């Protein structure tokens, strides 16, 4: 439009919870197919995130739940978090640990299938 000055800007997806907002752009895919993020969160934050009306919510897309840092948790804690992720809408729940490389290969394999593709 003539006479209108356009300012350059770039939208950065943010994950908001009761603990604050996470806006690190390298934690997200920006191709519109999938929003991947990792963040320490309790079930209240997960439920709150699903209730937020944003273009980044899951809607009718598949949801993958990932339990991270499994090497630091007990089996009871991992089981509890897996149930929270299922309650929050995750169809696939994977348990990972980067320290001993457990579950990482399975996560990447799932992300490269039609089932896991968002």
Curated annotation (Swiss-Prot):
Which Gene Ontology terms describe the biological processes this protein takes part in?
biogenic amine metabolic process
**Which Pfam family is an annotated match for this chain, by its short name?**
PduV-EutP
Report a single Gene Ontology molecular function.
Answer: ATP binding
Q: Which SUPFAM superfamilies did the record assign?
A: P-loop containing nucleoside triphosphate hydrolases
Looking up Gene3D superfamilies in the UniProt record yields: P-loop containing nucleotide triphosphate hydrolases
Write down the PANTHER family for this protein, in alphabetical order. Answer: PROTEIN YOEF
Anything further noted? Encoded by the CP4-44 prophage.
* Protein name, as recorded: Protein YoeF
Gene designation: yoeF
